[in-house]
């Protein structure tokens, strides 16, 4: 959504003098540091899409004034920075299927450094060259990226189809059950009553309590939950 500044911003804000380019970038980089916790210069720059050529001076100024602190992170080759007010984060509990444009995975180099999770959007990649699928969603579980799924919504059949799935090395066994629950939830808010899992998805290998038939079959679930069909 877009609107005119005078209809959105308070009058007091509009009456403030316009900051210089350097001052504006310094303020944005300071906000980036607050939001990201520990970050490289490239991470800080990318948060507000600041041109790479314009960040060296404001970062030096932020270091000099003590707003950000240079630090070293084990296994990171680049210099990192920590905001002076940074606090240790809380352990995250919960699950979510992430959009390719989610802030957690938007800046791919940072995602790979933090989670050892290499992720690319392959919609423009020729089908025979795709590694994981056309429109793959990362799966976040308890603060870790543990899987990725290639999904297709068959509106005519009322089915959310899991075409492919991959669990990351070291993913806990409960990741499969957590993924199924999130897929059910997604099918529900998409208005699709059924969930189908293709053989290539291989989710069933981590779900020994579910039985795979040679013909499409539904697995009994609790009332109000989607039906799951495993295809072989």
Residue ranges and their predicted role:
Residues 1-97, 102-105, 110, 117, ...:
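Long, low-complexity intrinsically disordered regions
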């Amino acid at each position: 959504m877009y609107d005119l500044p005078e209809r959105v911003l308070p009058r007091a804000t509009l009456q403030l003098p316009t900051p210089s380019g350097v001052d504006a970038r310094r303020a944005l980089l300071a906000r980036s540091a607050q939001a990201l916790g520990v970050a490289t210069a490239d991470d800080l720059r990318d948060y507000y899409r600041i041109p790479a050529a314009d960040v060296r001076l404001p970062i030096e100024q932020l270091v000099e004034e003590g707003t950000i602190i240079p630090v070293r992170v084990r296994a990171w080759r680049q210099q990192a920075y920590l905001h002076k007010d940074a606090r240790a984060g809380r352990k995250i509990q919960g699950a979510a299927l992430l959009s390719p444009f989610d802030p957690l995975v938007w800046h791919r180099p940072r995602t790979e450094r933090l989670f050892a999770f290499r992720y690319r959007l392959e919609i423009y990649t020729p089908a025979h060259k795709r590694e994981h699928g056309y429109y793959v969603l990362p799966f976040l579980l308890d603060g870790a990226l543990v899987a990725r799924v290639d999904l297709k919504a068959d509106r005519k059949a009322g089915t959310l189809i899991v075409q492919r799935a991959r669990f990351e090395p070291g993913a806990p066994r409960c990741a499969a059950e957590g993924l199924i629950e999130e897929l059910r939830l997604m099918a529900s808010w998409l208005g699709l009553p059924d969930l189908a899992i293709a053989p290539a998805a291989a989710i069933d290998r981590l779900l020994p309590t579910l039985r795979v038939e040679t013909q499409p079959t539904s697995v009994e679930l609790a009332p109000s939950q989607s039906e799951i069909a495993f295809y072989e």
